[in-house]
């Protein structure tokens, strides 16, 4: 069968604050079915999955278990990979965010964006949900609690670096409008446009100082 070209796909990478659950497994099986179908059609498929291994929640779980964060994520990531292999998923690459090559790449991209003015230092203030590792505004809360998990939130403020997403909002809106099939299904395109882009895209917090388990910023080690 003739090669129809490259086809890249990825799952969301499983967060390693706890053992994998049925939702993670459901996703890898669906993604694997798509990868196999595309290969059968003649596409050169590159199928990636993996684990997300940094964050405050993981640091706290490791401390509670009496082990280092790296030991903790090694255990969880190993269990994720064991299950992905047990269901015979045909991924081409299993990426871990603690992999040396991944960390080097993140640092290189961060520095490049900072040097070209797309990352700047500021301060983040809001209502913080530790389990979700998310900041919220008062208007986003549901009954005064985290809109994602329903738990209590706490006032928090910290110095942080931000990526200037707002700088690219008009370019994104124009591209999506001129390429109607770029985001599918249409309901997701409408969600992105109406909930994020058109109301005014906010700059993204890309560093933290309140915990240490992450990829350090080379030129500002407290982040």
Positions of the model-derived regions?
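Short clusters of hydrophobic/aromatic residues that line enzyme substrate/ligand-binding pockets
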Residues: 58, 62, 136, 146, ...
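Alpha-helix boundary/capping detector
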Residues: 64, 110, 139-140, 198
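Cys/His-rich short segments
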Residues: 116-173
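Structured secondary-structure scaffolds
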Residues: 2-49, 101-105, 149, 155-223
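Short secondary-structure capping/junction motifs at helix and strand boundaries
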Residues: 88-96, 114-127, 139-140, 154-156, ...
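Generic serine detector
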Residues: 17, 68, 77, 89-90, ...
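N-terminal Rossmann-like or analogous alpha/beta NTP/dinucleotide-binding catalytic cores
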Residues: 2-119, 133
């Amino acid at each position: 069968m003739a090669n129809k070209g490259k086809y890249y796909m990825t799952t969301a990478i499983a967060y390693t604050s706890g053992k994998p659950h049925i939702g993670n497994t459901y996703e890898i099986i669906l993604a694997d079915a798509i990868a196999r179908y595309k290969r059968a059609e003649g596409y050169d498929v590159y199928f990636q999955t993996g684990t997300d291994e940094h964050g405050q929640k993981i640091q706290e779980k490791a401390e509670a278990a009496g082990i280092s964060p790296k030991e903790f994520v090694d255990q969880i990531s190993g269990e994720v990979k064991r299950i992905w292999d047990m269901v015979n998923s045909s991924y081409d690459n299993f990426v871990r965010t603690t992999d040396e090559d991944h960390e080097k790449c993140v640092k290189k991209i961060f520095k490049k964006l900072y040097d070209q003015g797309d990352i700047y230092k500021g301060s983040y203030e809001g209502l913080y949900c530790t389990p979700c590792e998310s900041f919220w505004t008062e208007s986003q809360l549901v009954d005064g609690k985290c809109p994602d998990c329903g738990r209590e939130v706490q006032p928090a403020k910290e110095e942080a670096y931000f990526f200037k997403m707002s700088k690219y909002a008009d370019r994104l809106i124009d591209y999506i409008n001129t390429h109607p099939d770029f985001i599918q299904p249409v309901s997701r395109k409408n969600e992105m446009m109406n909930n994020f882009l058109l109301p005014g895209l906010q700059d993204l917090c890309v560093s933290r100082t309140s915990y240490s388990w992450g990829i350090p910023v080379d030129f500002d080690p407290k982040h």
